[in-house]
């Protein structure tokens, strides 16, 4: 295992210097190919973390991951209301909430958005998006062709990250041994193989909101909201949400309150989640229109922002209202049942 070809780049990092986007692409491509020892990988990730990753470094790492990913066979639309949207969080916010973004994906799709949700197993709670979906019998290992058919037929598909990004396995032992956040903690939402034009992306720290919006711009995302909601990696029902919105090539920063979204404030304790089986019951109740007000509102404000970002709603408030009416209709639960059926019809 030789890293001679990237040693000059490693030396730059060890000197506290920044890498260009192209250099970051080269060094992370080597990692993905399994050409880097665990010791070298740990040194690289810690060097980046201690200095603080730049926009170019995050973008280059995402470029490498995207280039190496299994292809998702889908032709994206390129206009508002037509392209693909993802509702995703970095995880790692430390709160054990219900599966808000995953549940919101069903609501947004039932309201007319084309949602390709890129997810993994739990990071910040007892139940990640993939843990939850497995409870409903949704086949996480569905082939890319099957996922594409789901997106065509149902406006929704889930792309299980390890199924598309096999090279990440090389970093697993190092990430576990380091026991600290690294660049990989923000890469997941940036490497959706469907290449969504529109994104609602939650981050675990308010310091990441603007930088990640800049990364999305560098990666060619058309329109996005990057959010941190009073400790959560999603739009908050219990306090203010910090937003960096990417629109028409510009990034504007502002804050949202629950009142701005047309819903009352709730306590974070009202959103506490549990194990996958318990969270599945909560998600089912929400999607059937039988959830608590706090649960329904938390999901609706996130689905509503996604509907705004992808152009179906003209404001976050009207998006939230559309999401709430979709929840009450029960359409989102019908969609869940259909996805479970279609996703399991064809095995790879």
Swiss-Prot record:
Q: State its cofactor.
A: Mg(2+)
Q: Which terms under GO biological process does the entry name?
A: L-tryptophan biosynthetic process
Bound cofactor: record note: Binds 2 magnesium ions per monomer.
Please state the pathway this protein functions in, per its UniProt record.
Amino-acid biosynthesis; L-tryptophan biosynthesis; L-tryptophan from chorismate: step 2/5
Q: From which domain of life does this come?
A: Bacteria
* Family annotation (Gene3D superfamilies): Nucleoside phosphorylase/phosphoribosyltransferase catalytic domain, Transferase, Pyrimidine Nucleoside Phosphorylase, Chain C
Q: Name one GO molecular function term.
A: magnesium ion binding
GO CC list: cytosol
Binding residue positions for 5-phospho-alpha-D-ribose 1-diphosphate: 89, 92-93, 97, 99-102, 117-125, 129
Catalytic reactions on record? N-(5-phospho-beta-D-ribosyl)anthranilate + diphosphate = 5-phospho-alpha-D-ribose 1-diphosphate + anthranilate
Binding residues annotated for anthranilate 1, in chain numbering: 89, 120
Q: Where does Mg(2+) 2 bind?
A: 233-234
Query: Which SUPFAM superfamilies does UniProt cross-reference here?
Result: Nucleoside phosphorylase/phosphoribosyltransferase catalytic domain (SSF52418), Nucleoside phosphorylase/phosphoribosyltransferase N-terminal domain (SSF47648)
Q: State which residue ranges cross the membrane.
A: none
Q: Does the keyword Plastid apply?
A: no
- Per its database record, what is this protein's job? Catalyzes the transfer of the phosphoribosyl group of 5-phosphorylribose-1-pyrophosphate (PRPP) to anthranilate to yield N-(5'-phosphoribosyl)-anthranilate (PRA).
Give the PANTHER family listed for this entry.
Answer: ANTHRANILATE PHOSPHORIBOSYLTRANSFERASE
Its family remark reads: Belongs to the anthranilate phosphoribosyltransferase family.
* Assembly notes: Homodimer.
Q: What is this protein called?
A: Anthranilate phosphoribosyltransferase
Species of provenance: Shewanella putrefaciens (strain CN-32 / ATCC BAA-453)
Q: What is the lineage of its organism?
A: Bacteria, Pseudomonadati, Pseudomonadota, Gammaproteobacteria, Alteromonadales
Underlying gene: trpD
């Amino acid at each position: 295992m030789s890293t001679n070809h990237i040693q000059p780049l490693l030396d730059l990092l060890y000197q506290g210097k920044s890498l260009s986007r192209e250099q970051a692409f080269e060094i992370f491509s080597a990692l993905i190919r399994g050409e880097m020892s665990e010791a070298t990988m740990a040194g690289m990730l810690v060097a980046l973390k201690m200095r603080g990753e730049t926009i170019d470094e995050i973008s280059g790492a995402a470029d490498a991951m995207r280039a190496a990913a299994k292809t998702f066979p889908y032709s994206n639309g390129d206009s508002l209301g037509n392209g693909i949207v993802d509702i995703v969080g970095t995880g790692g916010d430390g709160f054990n909430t219900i599966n808000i973004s995953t549940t919101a994906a069903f609501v947004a799709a039932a309201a007319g958005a084309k949602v390709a949700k890129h997810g993994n197993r739990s990071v910040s709670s007892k139940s990640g998006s993939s843990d939850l979906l497995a409870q409903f019998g949704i086949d996480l290992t569905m082939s890319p062709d099957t996922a594409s058919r789901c997106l065509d037929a149902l406006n929704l598909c889930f792309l299980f990250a390890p199924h598309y990004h096999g090279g990440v396995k090389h970093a697993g032992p190092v990430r576990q041994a380091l026991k600290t956040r690294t660049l990989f903690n923000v890469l997941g939402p940036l490497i959706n193989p469907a290449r969504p034009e529109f994104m609602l992306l939650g981050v675990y720290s308010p310091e990441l909101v603007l930088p990640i919006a800049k990364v999305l711009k560098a990666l060619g995302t058309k329109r996005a909201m990057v959010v941190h909601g009073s400790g959560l990696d999603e739009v908050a029902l219990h306090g203010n949400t910090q937003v960096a919105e990417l629109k028409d090539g510009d990034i504007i920063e502002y804050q949202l309150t629950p009142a701005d979204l047309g819903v009352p404030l709730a306590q974070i304790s009202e959103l506490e989640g549990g194990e996958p089986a318990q969270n599945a019951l909560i998600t089912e109740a929400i999607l059937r229109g039988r959830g608590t007000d706090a649960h329904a509102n938390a999901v609706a404000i996130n689905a509503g922002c996604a509907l705004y970002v992808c152009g179906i709603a003209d404001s976050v408030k009207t998006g939230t209202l559309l999401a709430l009416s979709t929840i009450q209709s029960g359409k989102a639960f019908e969609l869940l049942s259909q996805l479970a059926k279609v996703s399991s019809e064809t095995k790879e």
